């Protein structure tokens, strides 16, 4: 596996920053079967952290448990976001507390243009990056702002999903399989953009 040296350097620097997302003794299950058992973690401000594992290892379940989005839910342990107890929240409360999630299926809304997808994300506070700033971050989206979101390429849909998350005022951004099925040139473009986002203070 190739690792971008900038990611390693930035992650090492971030270890000295305060933890913004933490979990202790985290368990989650489907039915009677545990999918996630005894996970502990700290994610620091300015850190890019990756979950690595085979298919079925529980990566998506871990992210969904942190974000409180459906089953499985955490049944034991604690998750804290900037001193706020995520383990006591519903998904909409976690989002309002500053947790952003880009799911693997991206969930681009049919019938809405790129711009309308972003506007919908800002229909209620807390509002994050302005739409024009997001177009500066993702020029491809600015060029296609009037195009229906679901007609974009896979890579452009992923950019839209990330931009939509940033349209909210978030402290942590979780990405589930962000590069799955994308061309290497798009992966490189998104990776560089994520590093730029981190350098802007996330």
Cite the ranges covered by each PLM segment.
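Glycine-rich phosphate-binding loops of nucleotide-dependent enzymes
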Residues: 2-202
